Amino acid sequence: MPLSNNVIGCINFITVLLSIPVIGAGIWLAIGTVNSCVKLLQWPVIILGVLILLVGLAGFIGGFWRITWLLVVYLIAMLILIVLLGCLVGFIYMVTIRGSGHPEPSRAYLEYSLQDFSGWLRRRVQRSYKWERIRTCLSTTTICPELNQRYTLAQDFFNAHLDPIQSGCCKPPTKCGFTFVNPTYWISPIDMSADMDCLNWSNDQNTLCYTCDSCKAGLLANIKVDWLKADIFLLLALIGLIIVYIIGCCAFRNAETEDIFRKYKQGYT
C-alpha cells in the first residue's frame, strides 16, 4: 500500500532536521577562538548544511502537495549532497588522522612538531602571507595572557595540561632550555640552541612564539581536535540522510505518484 503524502512529507522533514547538526558544526567551527583565526572548511560546511536544508524543504513541500517534479529534484539533489557530505567527512578524517603531541621530561603538557601533520594542513599555515594574518589574529586573543593569571609558580606551570596552541605559541619549546619567570616571560640560556623556534622566541607579549613552527603545530593540533569532533556530527548526519534518502526513494516509488511510472511503461507497450 502506497505511503500517504503526509508520511512522505514527514520523512522529508527529517532531512530538514538532519541539516541542523551540519549547519551547527560549521557555525561551531567558525566561532571558536582558534578556528575563527583560520578560515578553512567552516563556510563549505555551513553552505552544505544550508543546501541540505533547502533541498529537504523542497522534498517536504513536494511530498505534502504532491508536486512530482519537486520530488524528483529533491531525490537528485539530495543524492548529490549526500555524496558531497560523504566526501567531506572522509576528507576531514584523512587530513586530521596524523599529528599528535610528544611528551617532555618533567612536563605535563605536550610539545608539537609541524612535520607530524598532513601536508594539506601544513600548507594552510606555512605560506607567510597566510600565517601573518593568523598570527595577528592569535596575538589579539587571551589565549596566552590568561596563563599569567592562572600560573605563577614554575612547577604549577610545568604540571599544567596546556592546550596545544598554548604549548606551541605562548612559551618557548622545552628543548630550548629557557628559564621560567612566568608563563609568557622566559630567560634565554647563555648557550642557546640554534633551533629556529628558540631564536624566534621573544618576551614581547605581542610576539612570543607566534612565528615559531611549534605555534603552527599547536594551532593545527587544536584544529584537529575540533574538526574530529565536528566530523562525528557530520558522520551521524550522513548516516541519517542515507537512511532517510533510501526510505524516500521507496516512498516515491510506492506513493500515488506511481501513475507517472505507469504512463512511462505504457509508452513502450
Swiss-Prot record:
Source domain of life is: Eukaryota
* Organism classification: Eukaryota, Viridiplantae, Streptophyta, Embryophyta, Tracheophyta
One Pfam match:
Tetraspanin
Write down the species.
Arabidopsis thaliana (Mouse-ear cress)
Intervals, Cytoplasmic compartment: 1-10, 66-71, 253-269
Q: Which residues form a coiled coil?
A: none
Known glycosylation sites:
200
Per the record, membrane topology reads:
Multi-pass membrane protein
**Mutation effect (residue 177 to E):** In trn2-2; twisted organs and impaired auxin flux, with an enlarged peripheral zone in shoot apical meristem (SAM)
Q: What else is known?
A: 'Ekeko' is derived from Inca language (quechua) for small and hunchbacked fortune god.
Name recorded for this polypeptide: Protein TORNADO 2
Q: What's this chain's function? A: Involved in the basipetal transport of auxin (IAA) that modulates growth and organs organization, as well as cell differentiation. Regulates shoot apical meristem (SAM) organization in the peripheral zone. Required for initial meristematic divisions in the epidermal/lateral root cap leading to the formation of epidermal cells and a clone of lateral root cap cells, as well as for the maintenance of the radial pattern of cell specification in the root, thus regulating the distinction between the lateral root cap and epidermis. Together with WIH peptides, promotes megasporogenesis.
Spans within the Extracellular topological domain:
32-44, 93-231
Q: Name one GO cellular component term.
A: membrane
